[in-house]
């Protein structure tokens, strides 16, 4: 009888761990459908001359501000406003105050290394991706550098650039056991280079 109780308890705990570990992945993927709908509505409103923050669901504290596509890695992501934990659970996030596609300066986009930005470990210098703005305009960027930055010592530079850059930022190393360490992997891309 004790053996049966131990087996049942282990099965319940194991099942709970499996469900819990899959939760963030499922949430991130399912939310993409709602976010895609919000993005389409954002584009339609922009065509009509209406600037609006179209939230993917009524209680959302974020909304799509750009679309990033990278065919080589089969990437099609909607960039959300803000880099809070809530926003990053659903997609990569735009760092408020950084630049916009097509404008001088650096647009900074953060994402989790184990979900939306897991592909960054496979990108190479020279690869291209596109950024679509909420007005529908598309800008093509080429990767020019990949760096590892220690946030306890170094500051991510976003100002003072004459060129239009996009900086994709995620935690590093990609296979770290503990999340949120001090290192960041920064992929920098330049407009049309």
Model regions: which residues?
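Solvent-exposed, non-transmembrane regions of membrane-associated and secreted proteins
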Residues: 4-193
């Amino acid at each position: 009888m004790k053996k049966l109780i131990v087996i049942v308890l282990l099965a319940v705990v194991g099942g709970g761990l499996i469900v819990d570990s899959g939760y963030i992945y499922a949430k991130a993927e399912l939310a993409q459908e709602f976010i895609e709908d919000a993005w389409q509505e954002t584009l339609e409103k922009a065509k009509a001359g209406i600037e609006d923050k179209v939230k993917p669901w009524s209680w959302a504290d974020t909304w799509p501000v750009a679309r990033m596509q990278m065919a080589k890695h089969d990437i099609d992501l909607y960039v959300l406003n803000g880099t809070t934990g809530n926003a990053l659970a659903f997609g990569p996030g735009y760092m408020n105050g950084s630049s916009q596609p097509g404008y001088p300066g650096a647009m900074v986009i953060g994402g989790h290394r184990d979900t939306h930005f897991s592909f960054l470990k496979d990108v190479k210098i020279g690869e291209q991706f596109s950024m679509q703005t909420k007005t529908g305009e598309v800008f093509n960027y080429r990767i020019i550098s990949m760096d590892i930055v220690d946030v306890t010592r170094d500051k991510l530079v976003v100002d003072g650039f004459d060129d239009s850059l996009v900086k994709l930022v995620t935690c590093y190393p990609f296979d770290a056991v503990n999340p949120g360490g001090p290192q960041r992997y920064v992929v920098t891309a330049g407009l049309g280079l």
